[in-house]
């Protein structure tokens, strides 16, 4: 408990995955982070989920050529994914989009060279992306431990969010549905 108190007393910032992702998960995570920041007077750092997902590839934990493009993907149900295209330095090549994946979705990038797809939306996409430059990297999930380098960079750069007004990035509007089984 003593070491926990020391850490709490020195808390300068809280990092949170800001989306896209599960509506409920984002709301809970961001609410918890905002509460900690408000209560401790700490800064809020928002880390986009797709950047967080790319960290293992950037750190070389999974192989990818230096000139390759990387495409982190989150499953958005059916054949839709939330995806963003980066170079190996995590510079944005194409902004985040909700893609309905077919053989043509990433063709312009695949025709130029190697493209590495990963995340929980990637496996289903590989069924329709039939290209020799398409590579699936398995077993990459957005982990809190991978947030540290991205959060530290934002901390050093002074990229903080307004605790009172920050909201998660959902990408798509929430659509409420009636449950299939009524009680």
Give the location of each predicted region.
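Residue-level signal for inorganic ion chemistry
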Residues: 14, 117, 148
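Short acidic capping loops at alpha-helix termini that bridge into adjacent secondary structure
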Residues: 9-12
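Catalytic-loop motifs flanking and including active-site residues across diverse enzymes
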Residues: 28-32, 102, 143-147
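Surface "functional belts" at beta-alpha junctions
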Residues: 43-142, 170, 175-176
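Alpha-helical scaffold segments in soluble metabolic enzymes
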Residues: 35, 56, 124, 128, ...
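DPxDG-like acidic metal-binding loop motif
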Residues: 15-49
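Short, small-residue-biased leader/transition segments that mark boundaries at the very start
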Residues: 1-7
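Acyltransferase
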Residues: 137-183
């Amino acid at each position: 408990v003593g070491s926990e108190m020391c850490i709490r007393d020195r808390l300068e910032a809280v990092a949170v995955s800001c989306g896209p992702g599960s509506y409920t998960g984002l709301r809970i995570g961001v609410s918890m982070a905002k509460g900690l920041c408000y209560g401790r007077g700490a800064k809020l750092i928002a880390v986009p989920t797709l950047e967080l997902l790319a960290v293992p590839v950037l750190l070389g934990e999974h192989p990818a050529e230096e000139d390759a493009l990387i495409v982190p993907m989150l499953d958005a149900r059916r054949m839709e994914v939330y995806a963003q295209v980066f170079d190996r330095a995590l510079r944005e090549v194409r902004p985040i989009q909700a893609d309905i994946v077919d053989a043509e979705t990433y063709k312009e990038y695949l025709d130029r060279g190697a493209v590495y797809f990963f995340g929980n939306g990637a496996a289903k996409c590989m069924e329709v992306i039939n290209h020799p430059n398409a590579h699936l990297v398995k077993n990459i999930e957005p982990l809190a431990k991978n947030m540290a380098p991205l959060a530290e960079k934002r901390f050093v750069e002074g990229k903080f969010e307004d605790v009172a007004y920050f909201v998660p990035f959902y990408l798509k509007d929430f659509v409420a549905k009636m449950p299939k089984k009524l009680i």
